[in-house]
Amino acid sequence: MTGASVADHTGRPIRVGLDVGGTKIDAVAVDPSGEIVGRLRRVTGWGDDAVVESIVAAVSALADEVGLPSSDIGSVGIGIPGLVDADAGRVDHAVNLGVESLELADRAEQALGIPFRVENDVKAAALGAAALSGVTGSMAYLNLGTGVAAGIVIDGRIWRGSRGTAGEVGHLSVDPNGRLCGCGQHGCVETFCGGGALAKAWGRPGALPIRDIFDAADAGDPLALALCTDLFHGAAAAVRVLVLSADVETVVIGGGLTALGDRLDGGIRAALHAGAEASPFMRSLRLDERIELLPAGSPAAAFGAALVGASITEKEIVPHG
């Protein structure tokens, strides 16, 4: 990301954050106090050009909603799936968007003349979840959606690791004889608690397979009961790994599966409690008391992208007033 032709927008009142998903963009406008003053959703395009066009359209529409010209936007942050080079503003292998390699920040800056920063979507969501939850120390954001991944925030900053893969707990193999994962391994955490893997294992038609699984489990269906158990134990395994490896104080759980609400929360807590019964050490960690569920529809991912776009050098988290 060169940014050579982008004007200095320091001090401009509005920061924009975009959570770019496979089907939709969730966009928020954030004022200097940290309040969300506008929010909208737009359909995501497919392929390099369409993705850029849909991002530009979302920013312009959001500016209209807030009642400001696009020139009053100080920065735009984008959270997007795939392998992201945050320094270069490039995203690679965003397969659900039809993107193999895209110089996203440069393309968007050329279209709007506004500074753009790009970050992996789950890492951006971790920042947003930390800010919205008021966490000031260490936390992890565990995303339970079609896939499974985590973002880790230590002392207000994203922890990326040496090669940017910190938090990829979905591809930790916990059962070498388990189901085949899309990554090529067997028995990954994602095969237990990822929405896509659960829907595939369920194998029955329906618009909302995860809800169908839970409804069938309530009716005593053996396969559904087994898949619910897999979900709870897989998510519990991810929580254990995050706490034991990074010693985070809190694990905030988000993603599409949080629409299950208390059923998901209670099941994961029960699995954590049961898994610690035989170990005084694990009991001492009180893992079942260290998880929080984001409300369904939370703007955490887009809000975190706005923080990323702000290019805050000392702290990436700002208080949410």
Give names to the regions the model predicted.
Residues 112-130, 140-142:
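ATP-dependent carbohydrate kinase catalytic cores
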Residues 137-192:
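Glycine-rich phosphate-binding loop of actin/hexokinase-like ATP-binding domains
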Residues 19, 75-81, 119, 141-147, ...:
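Short beta-strand segments
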Residues 1-75, 85-88, 110-114, 131-137, ...:
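ATP-binding/phosphotransfer module of carbohydrate and carboxylate kinases, centering on a glycine-rich
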